[in-house]
Amino acid sequence: STTSDAFNVSSLGSGADGTPGYPLISVWLTGKELKDAFEVDASVTALMPEAQIYGAGMTWTWNPHRMMFNKVTDCAQVLPDGSAVPIDDDRLYRVVTGLYTGQMLGTVNDQSFGILAITPKDAQGNVITDYEEHIIYNPNGSEVKEWYALASYLQSMGEVDGRYAAPEGRKVEHATWNPLNLLKNLNLFGWLAVLAAVLVLAA
């Protein structure tokens, strides 16, 4: 891989400095909001395959047969040693992502009609209103671009680690019609839909 290859992967947009490439930003989400982000990924991927979330340090499993915004059945935080721990709904987790992706996460509330809620915050839990204030900078004051972060990571390895030759299992599709799986970990919207279906069948 060359620097130009890495640039082509993440070459869109520009930051506050006007130079090519979206910069990385640092924001904080609650565990509940992370789970909602996974739901967005699982529900939207089938409709827009190009619009996917890939998260380092997290894993989630979804069932495509479940209802919209209720497709994720399991999720966890993956620690550096490879072990998985449950995600705490109330804890704040640091998320580093591109400026564009961060801005799009903030639109989920409206796009999901309030079913899902993702509100990026600062480390103290205050709602972010200007994402450019949370851009990550190099020691020399320049923005850390998405493409540059990727190029630097590839360069640090010398030869690309063989584990990248195949998916790491961070996003797992588990298609099943098993009733227990279809009802597992439903959110409020899911249970209301189930209740409505039961009432219709009982009428």
Label for each model-derived stretch:
Residues 1-203:
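Catalytic centers of hydrolytic enzymes
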